[in-house]
Amino acid sequence: MKIKNAKDMDSSSIKLSATVYGKAGTGKTTLGATFPKPFFLDLNKGLLSIRGKNVDYVELYDSTWVEIQDTLDEAIKSPDHESIIIDSMGEVAEICMKHICQLNRRQKPEFADWDAFYQSMKSFIMKVRNSGKHSLCI
């Protein structure tokens, strides 16, 4: 067994991936702004805390599930950004469920809709995590 020292680790290929949950005003968005070359998908008008910083973002306040997916695909392809920040996953989940209900012509989700919701959210999160970029889901 070869003993290694942590100071010799090459971290250049390691991508940060995290989910942060907390009350409003606890610094989640500010944390996201510290990620390398971040790109924010802003779904809840919560970027006031990073106003004035050199951070790119797109407003997705009244977007559809398809628009969010398309924007994520563009962010993944962007050579100008090293990190994808989703703010907030709660909004993503609401829009996802709304989309599923619309597809099934329902006003409210029924038992059968929850599996589709789970699969859609899992796919979305895996796409973010496996994007080859740093990622933070708020």
Task: Show where each model-derived region lies.
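Conserved P-loop
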Residues: K2-I95
